[in-house]
Regions:
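Active-site nucleophilic cysteine motif
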Residues: 30-41
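Short terminal alpha-helical segments
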Residues: 1-31, 92
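Position-driven detector of the extreme protein N-terminus
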Residues: 2-5, 65, 84
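Amphipathic alpha-helical binding modules
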Residues: 67-116
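Short amphipathic alpha-helical segments that mediate assembly, nucleic-acid/protein binding
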Residues: 9-13, 35, 51-57, 72, ...
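Amphipathic protein-protein interaction modules
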Residues: 46-80
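Structural helix-adjacent loops and short alpha-helical linkers that scaffold large soluble proteins
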Residues: 3-5, 46-53, 103-106
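Generic structural signal for hydrophobic core residues of well-folded globular domains
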Residues: 16, 20-23, 39-46, 63, ...
Length: 116
């Protein structure tokens, strides 16, 4: 997966995080589908290719799964069940951190990625 991370992913996720934070309702909730909408809007605003947006969505879904979300793809398409915006922001922040680690690899991290 490391070779499939678009250069624009970090910026897309940061803009998405800001948008989701702003659009949360008064109860501090949002729909998972709103995260996908915000991803798409961020990508369009940055002028990136649709494939880069989809790859960034895949990174987010994998991050969500690593944080315990059983069906992240379904959550990102859901417009009926609200989730706490804190949960959405945690997913987005973790994805940003993960991409940041890829952009600034530490000594020895390549071997741990290859073996894992």
């Amino acid at each position: 997966m490391t070779n499939m991370v678009p250069a624009s992913s970090s910026e897309i996720l940061k803009r998405t995080l800001d948008t989701v934070r702003i659009r949360a309702n008064s109860n501090g909730e949002c729909f998972g589908g709103e995260i996908t909408d915000a991803l798409r809007e961020a990508g369009v605003a940055l002028g990136v290719d649709r494939l880069e947006i989809l790859l960034t969505r895949t990174i987010l879904a994998r991050t969500m799964e690593s944080l315990g979300e059983s069906y992240p793809a379904e959550v990102l398409q859901d417009y009926q069940n609200r989730m706490p915006v804190s949960k959405a922001l945690r997913y987005l922040n973790e994805a940003i951190v993960w991409i940041g680690k890829l952009e600034t690899p530490e000594v020895g991290s390549l071997s741990s990625v290859c073996s894992g």
